Curated annotation (Swiss-Prot):
HAMAP family xref list: Cas1 (MF_01470)
Protein residues bound to Mn(2+): 156, 222, 237
PANTHER family: CRISPR-ASSOCIATED ENDONUCLEASE CAS1
Pfam families on file: Cas_Cas1
Superkingdom of the organism of origin: Bacteria
GO MF annotation list: DNA binding; DNA endonuclease activity; metal ion binding
Group of enzyme by EC: hydrolase
Origin organism lineage: Bacteria, Pseudomonadati, Nitrospirota, Thermodesulfovibrionia, Thermodesulfovibrionales
Gene that this polypeptide is encoded by: cas1-2
Keyword DNA-binding listed: yes
Descriptive protein name: CRISPR-associated endonuclease Cas1 2
Record keywords: Antiviral defense, DNA-binding, Endonuclease, Hydrolase, Magnesium, Manganese, Metal-binding, Nuclease
Record-listed E.C. numbers: 3.1.-.-
Role played: CRISPR (clustered regularly interspaced short palindromic repeat), is an adaptive immune system that provides protection against mobile genetic elements (viruses, transposable elements and conjugative plasmids). CRISPR clusters contain spacers, sequences complementary to antecedent mobile elements, and target invading nucleic acids. CRISPR clusters are transcribed and processed into CRISPR RNA (crRNA). Acts as a dsDNA endonuclease. Involved in the integration of spacer DNA into the CRISPR cassette.
Species per Swiss-Prot/TrEMBL record: Thermodesulfovibrio yellowstonii (strain ATCC 51303 / DSM 11347 / YP87)
Length: 330
């Protein structure tokens, strides 16, 4: 299985013949191209056109993040799998209000079901979350009445507000208090973890879209515009609770991530390099971990689940099979 490469240090990414290496002031590390799926760059890294040409030939994506861990863009090799037919079907389902709303509703419903699964998981392990679960279930009953994607987004936002109230109960750690959701910049340690982990889920979904016939620029819950990819944001809603949030709960509850892994920057709090390494390792392990897939009858990784989700969306767009969002079984 191909791997993701994370570069946190400053240095230069270079091509040498048919391989890559990353060079810092202290060392040179060779990168096996045949085993690399994508490169995520968090440090100050220089490269040249010759390298980018080689990455295109090797079909390796580069995702760039700023110092604070926010996604800023990708080097996306030419769309070798893009299908004109699929782009037309994506556009058709976006331009038709009913078809777009149908898909958007499924993304929200999938996200909410997985949020509930996470809460039930911790409730069954001694965390008192019954009131929050009941409130989320109550709000979710309004989804079928939505007539616009804005209304759907409002409901999801309301549910996430209640969901975030569970974080302090689940974590029970005086060094990691949620308070309220803040971003750009995050105001505390938990928000710094959430923002960083969410960025990783967005880019993972983008990398997997690249391996399908879908175009990431056409989403349904998040409005398509000139500025950004949106389909990966839609799909990420389903997986953030079971990948990003579970990763955060794990490293905080196990005391793996600590206050010294954060630093103040301007008017916010960000992960330092060691903190980023800790969360990156946990996220990578979670994406590579497997579950038993009921329909396929075999174990698949969480990264593979994202790819399978995209294949289901393709079938829906081609009107071969109605899309049903993935809901975890634990």
């Amino acid at each position: 299985m191909k791997k993701s490469l994370y570069i946190i240090s400053d240095g230069e990414l270079k091509r040498k013949d048919n391989t890559l290496y990353f060079e810092t002031s202290e060392e040179r590390k060779y990168i096996p191209v045949e085993n690399t799926r994508e490169i995520l760059i968090f440090g100050e890294v220089s490269m040249n056109k010759r390298l980018l040409e080689f990455l295109t030939e090797s079909e390796i994506i580069i995702h760039f993040f700023n110092y604070y861990g926010y996604y800023i863009g990708s080097f996306y090799p030419r769309e070798h799998l893009n299908s004109g037919y699929m782009i037309l079907k994506q556009a058709e389902h976006y331009l038709d209000t009913g078809k777009r709303l149908n898909l958007a509703e499924k993304f929200v419903s999938g996200a909410i079901e997985n949020i509930k699964k996470v809460l039930i998981y911790y409730h069954n392990r001694g965390k008192e979350l019954s009131e929050i679960i009941s409130k989320i279930q109550e709000i979710a009953t309004n989804i079928p009445d939505c007539s616009t994607t804005d209304e759907l987004m409002a409901i999801e936002g309301n549910i996430r507000d209640y969901y975030y109230q569970s974080f302090d109960i689940i974590l029970d750690n005086e060094h990691f208090i949620f308070e309220t959701r803040t971003k750009r910049p995050p105001k505390n340690r938990i928000n710094a973890l959430i923002s960083f982990a969410n960025s990783l889920v967005y880019t993972t979904c983008l990398s997997e879209i690249y391996q399908t016939h879908l175009d990431p620029r056409i989403g349904y819950l998040h409005a398509t515009n000139f500025r950004r990819f949106t389909l990966n944001l839609d799909v990420a809603e389903i997986f953030k609770p079971i990948i990003a949030d579970r990763a955060i709960f794990s490293i905080v509850n196990k005391r793996i991530v600590k206050p010294q892994h954060f630093e103040k920057k301007l008017d916010g709090i960000v992960l330092n390099d060691k903190g980023k390494q800790i969360l990156l390792q946990e996220m990578d392990e979670r994406l590579r971990s497997t579950i038993q897939h009921k329909k396929l009858g075999r174990h698949v990784s969480y990264r593979q689940l994202i790819r399978l989700e995209l294949y289901k969306i393709q079938k829906h767009l081609m009107e071969e099979e109605e899309y049903k969002p993935f809901v975890t079984g634990w």
